[in-house]
Amino acid sequence: MSGGDLGIEGISVSENQDLILAHGANSGIFLIDSNSPENNSHIEWSGDYSLLDSSFHPGGKTAIMVGEGGNVLRMTLANSSIEQAGGPSTFGDTLLTSVSWNGDGSWAYIGGEDGWIWRFRGTSDGGIEAIVLENRGDRVISGISCLRGHNICAITSTLGGIGIIDQEHGLHWIGGFGTPWVDIVCHSSEVPECIAISSDLTIASIVVVVSEPSETRVFDNDIVQLQGFVGAMTGIEAQSDGISLISLAPFGLIEHDKEAGRSFHWLDNIDAVEFDVEISDQRIVGTWGSGFFEGWLITDRGTLVSFGPVDQNEGDSMLEIWIGVIILGGATLLVASLMVSSSPKLSNWLTKRIGSEEERKDVLRKERVQSRKKGRA
């Protein structure tokens, strides 16, 4: 990946969580190692259109991307090859905005402007099959997310409401009408639940009735407009154990805990500005976890930022420290907040993670000395 403004528009995470597929302007396609993002590659493709969304197949061997002009691409992960999997002859000139494979990978659902939504798959003879779903609306399909283990998916439509797609590809509108929904993510936990977000800081929690998806409903008390937060929600990604991170514009993050039914400040824009004015002016495109309350985010310009908390006190989920920035295709910049100078514990933790070999050895020696002193006390 080269430096500069890459125009990243979206990401997806592979089934085994080891790969990130990023894509955007001018058919830019990038593969990133989720745990070591400095290992990344630009995948060549000659298109000149924006790729807005993507989804890995549950089988882990391919991924599809959708975007402008009705274009659909398929990537084969074994050799990182790209092929055209659909175009204007199938989807017209429709702006394709969202895509997700269903639970067993038998069909993908592709959504676009004007409420268009198709079920899509490749055929054994190398062709494709794309069938328009009945009962579609007339507003852009802003998000699609599917439950693993069930061939049930949830969709959001900007001002058009929230819908459920059942095992027979029936589309059922279940509520949330008139809200500017921008994205949705489903957690395939013991109680299957999807979280929808809107640009006006509204969150909807949808408990899916797996036995009869059409009976799923979004009630008034399932929808909450957050107070005390600033910005517009732009995207949501599942992290782990019912935790999601919600991206904000301007640059910020909210943690949502579906088990607790609560949302928490994770990173406020004012903190991001104090950290780095240039980075805070960028748009967060996606996030993924790499450990307990640790992970990465990627911006529209292709900047990757590693994050993790100083300490996780009960009820305190505020992001308090940045531990690294990677400018894709350029140098790695190791940075930390001013809190380092006033917190020996944090300083040592950071040194062990990102310090030089000699610095790490020095910290370990000091910790061993302190441990022996405590043992003699």
Predicted region positions:
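Residue-level hotspots at or immediately adjacent to binding/recognition sites across diverse folds
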Residues: 1-377
